[in-house]
Amino acid sequence: ELFEQTAASAPKDKRFHGYHLYAVDGMKGELPKTPELSAKYCETEKCKTPVFHAVSTFDILNEMFIRSKFHFGIADERELAGKMIDAVAQDVYYKDEPQIWIFDRGFPSLSLIQKLLEHRLYFVMRVSSSFLKEVNAFRKSKYVDRVIHIEYSECRATQNHVHSEGISQFDLRCVRVKLPSGEDEILVTNLDRKDFPKRDIKEIYRLRWGIETGFNYLKNAVFVEEFVSKTENGLAQDYFVSLLIYNFATCICGSMYPNIPKKENTSTRSIEELPPD
């Protein structure tokens, strides 16, 4: 609770076209190698090192972790992401704030999109080549930026062995970007093309890299895996203390050096523009 309260009260002035950008991603790490933890939380039978799995929501532009779910062993990232979306959407500190949620290709699912739509939240997602058939059809087409209609009937859900209780009909905007390898990357969103042209969608997804940088600092600067406790409750507390330290450091550095430009991650800048439709 202390972590969430301090994150909510911290200054968060930076936005993208008036919107907060929230990236969601997961991180795995090692737990202390005790007999008790090794017996319960090893990733595989051959591996004797117990692990944890954490899924976090990161305010990209303000470089702040605002929510996180800590799980012993391997977790269902989509399930934990859904719980965080519910929590943020109902939190008095966040629910009325304009926000865009960003996900890498391991997260998109019908249920996650339904949840975001039900909460009236905007999103940008990178999708895999085995997503909804309508999105796959767009991938095979020559379109670059196109709105498609999704109709997920009860019959379709049964045939695909998918549990669906949310919105069954909705529109998705598909955006194609070209990677340096020559492959196409498909992003899906519910942001309007007039307000957010293709270049903005690409930039929003590019900014997702901030959460990867945050995880890197947690592991290599805050040393999140260097636990003090050996009990499960204590280990969880140690983890959230690491997030507190990260957020405090961000606030202090931001207030002391507000005008220092950040180093650009050039590896994500090499996306080529495709010709328009």
Regions found by a protein language model. Give the residues of each.
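Extracellular beta-strand-rich solenoid/capping regions of secreted or surface-exposed proteins
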Residues: 42-43
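Short secondary-structure boundary/capping segments
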Residues: 38-39
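Phosphate-interacting basic helix/loop segments used at nucleotide- and nucleic-acid interfaces
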Residues: 5
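Single, function-defining residue in the core of a domain
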Residues: 1, 11, 15-20, 27-35, ...
